[in-house]
């Protein structure tokens, strides 16, 4: 039977197995608290994320299940990987992943990035997105704080599956807004992998400039700032707007011409400007893909078609439209965790009694 150790972090109880020691707070996200720790089994430093109240509502249970499924499925050098998962006696869920020293947000706020680092970071972001998109997954919330970096400049994308389309009035998503694709703001309907390319373009611009490209105060201001640089959206984009209020707002904006990005990024390499122009396109269908971006001249120093893999299998989203009670999500979650630990549960009852095993 596994032994659990309790610690108070930011007023939150961390209840972990004795396999992990030296807990230190790393950051607080919207849905969980992250600590660094030492894995006694491997002698590696790891990140442990406690999911807050995973079974308190069906929405939270589903979100946790989605993140678990995605972490299990996505296996790529530029995507964060799961090294352990367990459920504590208090029924909190803990994800254990590799620990990277910092994130792109911290790097960008501490010093300007040199050209070769910008190039290498963007290459790794696009390499990761090529894989993720080939698995049929859209990140939806790509931003500098979701891009982890270690001392060797290895980069990994994290926080998959948590971000959903949020209520425009919802607070606490200010930083997310800066990187949000216009089709999400304009239509709030079906969107696809192109939203991640837009976000990556905003991050690329921020690496070049040292500050956010579109720092909107709210969604209205955000969209207005975008049009100041990229001009008025074309008619085929405007025609996709379903909301009359949104349509009225867009049509009320003054007609604007797209500004050449070379005028804004005066010190950037012309090939960097060309790639950025192809990423920041209003019409998602005309936006460059991750695969195409990897083959762009700007990323030529790192591009290797033989070492930019795609996913072997598409991610199974069949659960995503399910409207299930908490207890059902809990059983499904236990099943996934047991599968991760290569344990077969003979029955649902046995699944629910496996918590002590799962923590070992």
Curated annotation (Swiss-Prot):
Pfam family, one: Pkinase
Modification after translation: Dually phosphorylated on Thr-171 and Tyr-173, which activates the enzyme.
Primary gene name: HOG1
One annotated GO molecular function: MAP kinase activity
Activity: how regulated: Activated by tyrosine and threonine phosphorylation.
Active site: 141
PROSITE patterns cross-referenced by the UniProt entry: MAPK (PS01351), PROTEIN_KINASE_ATP (PS00107), PROTEIN_KINASE_DOM (PS50011), PROTEIN_KINASE_ST (PS00108)
Cited Gene3D superfamilies: Phosphorylase Kinase, domain 1 (3.30.200.20), Transferase(Phosphotransferase) domain 1 (1.10.510.10)
GO BP terms, alphabetized: stress-activated MAPK cascade
Domain Protein kinase: 20-299
Family: Belongs to the protein kinase superfamily. Ser/Thr protein kinase family. MAP kinase subfamily. HOG1 sub-subfamily.
Family matches, as SMART domains: S_TKc (SM00220)
Binding site for ATP: 26-34, 49
Location(s), subcellular: Cytoplasm; Nucleus
Protein name: Mitogen-activated protein kinase HOG1
Phosphothreonine: modified positions: 171
Transmembrane intervals: none
Catalytic activity as recorded in UniProt: L-seryl-[protein] + ATP = O-phospho-L-seryl-[protein] + ADP + H(+); L-threonyl-[protein] + ATP = O-phospho-L-threonyl-[protein] + ADP + H(+)
GO terms under cellular component: cytoplasm; nucleus
EC id: 2.7.11.24
Task performed by this protein: Proline-directed serine/threonine-protein kinase involved in a signal transduction pathway that is activated by changes in the osmolarity of the extracellular environment. Controls osmotic regulation of transcription of target genes.
Keywords: Activator, ATP-binding, Cytoplasm, Kinase, Nucleotide-binding, Nucleus, Phosphoprotein, Serine/threonine-protein kinase, Transcription, Transcription regulation, Transferase
Cofactor requirements of the protein: Mg(2+)
Motif range (TXY): 171-173
